[in-house]
Design a protein with these regions (language model features):
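Small/polar beta-strand repeat architecture
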Residues: 126-170, 174, 178-180, 185-187
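Solenoid scaffold repeats with emphasis on beta-solenoid/beta-helix
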Residues: 2, 6-7, 12, 20, ...
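Short, recurring structural edge motifs at helix starts
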Residues: 52-55, 159-161, 183-185, 214-219, ...
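Ser/Thr/Gly-rich low-complexity blocks that favor extended beta-strand/coil architectures
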Residues: 104-141
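Surface beta-strand/loop "capping" patches
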Residues: 86-115
Length: 351
């Protein structure tokens, strides 16, 4: 789905794809209603999709999943993100920059008249919006971009540019993310409004992963407003490593941007993430592994211990928090789980 608007897929079973099931790029308003990835056992298939079930890059408007069922994919159920392009040259007047798309062709991400954010590589912090006046293509991955305003002197070569015109609001509800997959549940990095509610997660890896990647995949989208509520998480994380690694995620919900805080005063990458009123059935300890979030809430959840699988996660604390601020963990019920414990890194006790 490329350069499209107002697209609906409804009541579709995807029984085999050699890659992703549904992929969207620079498209607006996409609805997936009762779209299911299903392993075709009659053809002796082992996977429904070789890669992600659903994947959306630099889309905007609303991406909605309603009543979808994801099983048997070779990678994640859903990934929604933008793209960082690296600044490789800046003109003397700072009104022209050269961009390099490290993992993704820059010409497919940026167009004339798009607004952009410059990003500090070392912190992930955004600068003021600017606008692309025109683009000269050097190759599919290299663009020379003329800006309306000079690039602020804070930014230089090896920093990044993110598209500020193309990012999505997201609604995911009444879906099932099943165990018969190799990787994680849903990956969400977008500054739009995100609501995840009334879903069932039985994922092999972490159920929800929120990143922001400036060192490998270069997937952008620092979160500003995310509400995860009234979901059922059931024995997620069975792909975790038993040899000290993190496997497919450190905890039930992992928030792990590339930026690593140096101390308690380091800037934060994500903001306003609320995890509330969920039911969590877990055979292992780690509930949250969170880095660089301001305004994190884990409130009014019910955590119930199961013994369906042996504990294998490398993280042995309930909550691992690094460089976070204004955190509230309260009013939760723990049934058979024992007392929750914490690992705090670069955290002020007042936070």
């Amino acid at each position: 789905v490329v350069n499209c608007r107002n697209v609906c897929f409804e009541k579709i079973d995807l029984r085999h794809s050699p890659g992703m099931g549904v992929y969207g790029l620079r498209s607006e308003n996409i609805l997936l209603k009762a779209v299911c990835t299903v392993v075709n056992r009659s053809e002796k298939r082992r996977f429904s999709c070789a890669a992600d079930a659903f994947h959306f890059t630099n889309c905007r408007g609303l991406i909605e999943l309603d009543g979808c069922n994801c099983n048997g994919q070779g990678d994640d159920a859903l990934n929604i993100h933008g793209i960082y392009a690296r600044i490789v040259a800046v003109s003397k007047d700072r009104k022209q920059i050269e961009l390099f798309g490290v993992r993704f062709p820059a010409e497919r991400v940026f167009k004339a008249d798009d607004e952009i954010w410059p990003i500090v590589r070392t912190t992930g912090s955004r600068g003021a919006r600017n606008r692309i006046e025109r683009i000269v293509r050097k190759s599919s991955k290299r663009l020379v971009v003329a800006l309306r305003e000079p690039l602020d002197k804070t930014f230089r070569e090896d920093d990044f540019i993110e598209n500020a015109s193309w990012y999505a609001n997201v609604s995911i509800h009444d879906c099932y993310f099943g165990r018969a997959n190799r990787a994680r549940g849903i990956l969400l990095t977008t500054p739009g409004k995100v609501v995840v509610h009334n879903n069932r997660f039985m994922t092999a890896g972490t159920a929800i992963l929120i990143e922001g990647d400036t060192d490998y995949w270069f997937e952008s989208g620092a979160v500003c407003d995310m509400d995860i509520h009234d979901n059922l998480f059931e024995n997620c994380g069975t792909s975790a490593s038993n040899n000290g690694g993190s496997g497919w995620g450190e905890a039930l919900i992992s928030i792990t941007p590339s930026f690593r805080p140096a101390d308690e005063s380091s800037p934060v990458y994500h903001r306003n993430i609320r995890i509330r009123n969920n039911r969590i059935l877990t055979y292992d300890r780690p509930l949250l592994h969170v880095r660089s979030v301001e305004g994190l809430q884990f409130v009014a959840n019910c955590v119930e211990q199961t013994y369906d699988f042996p504990a294998t996660a490398a993280q042995r604390q309930s909550f691992c928090l690094e460089g976070c601020r204004n955190v509230r963990i309260a009013e939760n019920r723990f049934i058979g789980y024992g007392k929750p414990d914490f690992e705090l890194i670069h955290m002020n006790p007042n936070n």
